């Protein structure tokens, strides 16, 4: 079970993503502000942070703080949102730049991939097996 931090102001989109991630067995957390997201990240570092594309353009230093907490970064934008390209130094920090909600299946696949890599490299301890009812 991967801990995923969703940061943004589009509550409907984030709630839908959180439900999809929870249904896939992950532990999503929603932060509606940057400050709240940074506090949540510092308290319990997430495996992945999903951040709005506009935030990466406006405040790239936030990405460095999230990375320093050990989180991989995914950026998202919505239909009709900002389509300006990311500066090269920001591009190198992020795993993917997704168009949500259209690419929500790609988001789930990336979460599974990062979780698998974290388990393989020993970053995340495997969960103990469920006790069997005999």
Tell where the protein language model's regions lie, with residue ranges.
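Conserved sequence signature across two-component system core domains
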Residues: 7-8, 31, 49
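Two-component/phosphorelay signaling modules centered on CheY-like receiver
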Residues: 10-30
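Conserved phosphotransfer microenvironments
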Residues: 14, 34, 47-70, 78-87
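Short alpha-helical segment
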Residues: 36-38
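Active-site charged/polar residues at nucleotide-handling catalytic sites that mediate phosphoryl
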Residues: 43-44
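C-terminal output helix
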Residues: 98, 102-112
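CheY-like receiver
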Residues: 118-134
